[in-house]
Every structure is written in structure tokens, then in C-alpha cells.
Amino acid sequence: MVFYFTSNVISPPYTMYMGKDKYENEDLIKYGWPEDIWFHVDKLSSAHVYLRLQKDQTIEDIPKEVLLDCAQLVKANSIQGCKMNNINVVYTPWANLKKTADMDIGQIGFHRQKDVKTMTVEKVSKIVNRLEKTKDERFPDLAAEKEARDREERNEKKAQIQEIKRKEKEEMKKKKEMDELRSYSSLMKSENMSSNQDGNDSDDFM
């Protein structure tokens, strides 16, 4: 089971999601998307909350209101963190999550520590209450969704390559036509010059 939430403080809204327990967190880690940003309470046990961005967005593009929603949601889903104020929440792109065979279930590390950001949050109940009203329980096929996403990306890249090749072919055709036109113009000019010279020669014999 995966819990989905909607951050509708801005338009268009953003989708957040988290697993029910550490076992589902394993699947979320495995089948995350490059557009996902991972959130967790720093140095405490908590849910793994993911924010899904648009393809053209980066972690720097997250609106501060949405960032706060994610932080409040992950804080509220920490047994210790939910009782504390001014706790640190860490967040990083899904691609920066590192999972090795010797790690416990639900445990992760980072490929690059410099890509991990930290923010300090206080408890704001009204934000958590607003998010809870959007809560939706689903049983998604995460592997199938990831494959569909990757397939779409492959098709987009294929279409882009085909478009580039089409433009290159078109440019080559135009260049060839221009070269032929210049060659024809040069030939006509040469023939005209020869014709004029022939005319001058005939005048000399008169």
C-alpha cells in the first residue's frame, strides 16, 4: 500500500507519496523516478516521503510552500519527530539514494553528500491536517509504472533523434540544391561568355 497526498497550496498541485512501512520503502527506493525528491527526518526514524516533480524541474525549483508541506508530512510520520519542534529534515534527488546489499530493510545512504539538503521545521498542525484530507490509499504496480515512464522517455528521445535526422537531411537537400543552382549559374555564365566571344570573332572576319 502506498499513501498519496496532494500539495495544493499552489497551482498546478504537486503529488507526494510514502510507503506504509519499511518493507514498502524498499520498493519505493527501487522503483523511484528521476523526477522524485526524497525526504526524511534527519537522524530519526521516519517515513520516506517522495515529492514528484515535472520532468523539466530540479530540486532548486521546488516552491517553498511545497517544500514546507513535504517537511511537515515527513515530520508528522516520525514517532519521535512528531513530538519535537525545530527538527531537521533532509532531502535529496532519488538518484542520489544509495542502497547496498549489507544495508537493513528500508535503510539507505547517499552517493554524494553534497547533494543532500537540510531544512529546519517547526510543527504546524494545520498543514498536516490539510494534507491528511487529500490522503489516498492505493496499491500501485510500481514496477509497471516505472517501466511505462521509462518507455515514454525512450520514445521521446527516439522522436527527438528522428527529428534531428530529418532536419539534417533537409539541410543537406537544401545545400545540394544550392550547390546545383550555383553550378548551373556558373555554367550559364560560362556559356554566355563563350557565345559573346564567338560573336566578336565573326565581326573580325568581316
UniProtKB/Swiss-Prot annotation:
Residue ranges with Polar residues bias: 183-199
GO function terms (MF aspect): DNA binding
Membrane topology, record value: Single-pass membrane protein
Parts of the chain on the Cytoplasmic side: 132-206
Annotated stretches, region: DNA-binding: 20-24
Coiled coil region boundaries: 141-185
Transmembrane regions listed in the UniProt entry: 115-131
Region (Disordered): 139-206
Localization (cell): Cell membrane; Endomembrane system
Family classification: Belongs to the CCDC25 family.
Known partners and oligomeric status: Interacts (via cytoplasmic region) with ILK.
The protein's name: Coiled-coil domain-containing protein 25
